[in-house]
A protein has these predicted regions:
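Class I S-adenosyl-L-methionine-dependent methyltransferase catalytic core
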Residues: 1-145
Length: 145
């Protein structure tokens, strides 16, 4: 639907994309949609939220690379910011089979698989990355106490 609604009548604007990410195809669809929308609406700010999941790290990396390469092909001078908030270490969240978890877990708590969140910003506003990274670093320090 986003493809049909872009470009909007006003040239300036922003869109936040938050796919379900329930299926592997959601990652591919998000990348394809963003590159397509950026080609039609090259001055629009496009924000993509994505989860940081250890078991899908390669899929997420592929999605981000596809978006960045596609948007750079549309405009090699485009500003793209990739911001990440880590609430835990990536390796702290390993996948455990249910049987193994039930038999061997001392505390009976399965470690969460989501270790943070990311936001890819296409046509990011000036100084967004610098000001946001300082803020994110402070939040991470508070969370990890």
């Amino acid at each position: 639907m986003l493809k049909a609604l872009t470009p909007p009548k006003t040239k300036r604007g922003a869109v936040l994309i938050d796919p379900s990410y329930e299926e592997i195809k959601d990652y591919e669809d998000a990348a394809e949609t963003i590159v397509h929308v950026n080609k039609k609406w090259n001055n629009g700010i496009i924000l993509l939220w994505y989860p940081l999941l250890n078991h899908r790290s390669q899929i997420i990396e592929n999605m981000l690379n596809q978006i960045i390469e596609g948007c750079k092909k549309n405009n090699q001078n485009i500003e793209i910011s990739n911001l990440q908030l880590l609430v835990d270490e990536k390796d702290a969240h390993k996948e455990v089979a249910l049987k193994e978890f039930l038999e061997h877990s001392e505390d009976k708590k399965n470690p969460p698989r989501l270790y943070g969140s990311g936001m890819l910003v296409i046509n990011s506003p000036w100084m967004l990355k610098d000001s946001t990274e300082a803020f994110i670093n402070n939040i991470e320090k508070i969370i990890r106490r």
